[in-house]
Amino acid sequence: MKKYNLNENYEFVGLWSTPTDPEQLIPGVLKYNAETGINLELEGSFSGEEFNIIHGHASGVNITVVDCFSTSWTMNLGIEGMYAPSKIVGNKIIVGTVIESLDELILEHVVLETSDIKPWSKLSGFSKPLYDDINERRKFSLTYKLPDEKIFYSDEEVDIGLNCSLNFPSTFPLSEDLVFRESNSFKITNKVSKGGLFHSAHVDAIRKFISLATRTDVSCRSIKMKLKDHEPYVFILANLIPINLDYKAKKLSDYDMFFTLTEVEERIQELYSKWFIFYCKSPESINLYFYKTKGWQHDFFLTKAQALEEAHRQINPGTNKWGYQSRVEALFNKFCNVMAHTGDAQAFSNIVKDHRDYYSHWFEKKRNKVSNGLILGYLSRDVNLLLEMMLLNVIGFDETEILKIVENCMAYRSYLEIGREHYPSSSERRHLWASTSPIENM
């Protein structure tokens, strides 16, 4: 079967039916669009408005559309031959098989291919070219050995391994276009034959874990599934909400990432395990960090400020009676080795609270206490940094390790002016939060 990518568009033309009435076959076209979603346009209509499963044989493949609902209203006048087209929206498409229900679906394993994460994983089968003549470099030897699977995570229900694959050009060597594509993928094995799409939470948790580590937007290229007692792979198409960090690295380099796999390989299972537990416990705060805001500066600030509160509440269950300012000040003091570069803890927490109160409820009495422009930009990014350090702490890094991580990240080293204390005081510096200095709009 051909490969189906989540970031491409597809159309499947054929006949469609429901499990409750398999004899009613309606012609139509199923459209998958990476941006707009899944739409089934039928030359007729099924009875009902919601459908757990819709079957199709289209464009030469068997297809199952999952979690569907009709967006059309059709008046059934009982007139034979009446033309009554309808449109149905779906949540997921399984390409390659027909199933009666998700509960009956037993997957042996799932293979998740992400966007390029090799600079993070350092997992490759290529060796560096060896030149016969180092001066002329006219002849070289290049060797390749498929690397062994790296254990990423394991528990009672699943095993997750990180693998490497090489797409070898079929035209080699009789072509000018010699494109070797090596990619990393995660194999998620269903150890207990759990029914349904058991892998969904891990797919999302993995891409967010690596996005945090790399400070970049990691996406899913494809998801293929091996069904029990079903030889070929099948593919799933779904519109995953894209990760879009407000503050991200310019490129995938060791100096722009928080950490690489090689730096934490001995403890990667522990780190991901803690991350997955928190992912399941506090999805709201995680989503506020990873998903795109509207683009206004106060939106950048407010989403991170709200995530900060929710994450702190989940991590510290005994603090339900704490006020917002107390949470921010406690986090500032917890990571004071880093946050000291931004100013005073009490001043910072007070300013964050005033801005949170105003932008979340538009309190008129707080209008004269809020900022915009450059000052709000500093405040938004400082809150974002505090949230990132809290997430790094959640997955297992202590305060000393986090200080080193931030200091080794060139973007934050420059932003926080770490090491710049030896520069002349007359040089332009970043804004520092201080209770003695009133905030001015800039």
Model-identified regions with their sequence ranges:
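Short, charged N-terminal helix-start/capping segments
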Residues: Y4, Y32-E35, S115-K128, T216-Y233, ...
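A broad, structural surface signal
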Residues: L197-R215, E309, R313, R381, ...
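Long, contiguous, compositionally biased segments that the model treats as domain-scale units
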Residues: M1-F209, Y412
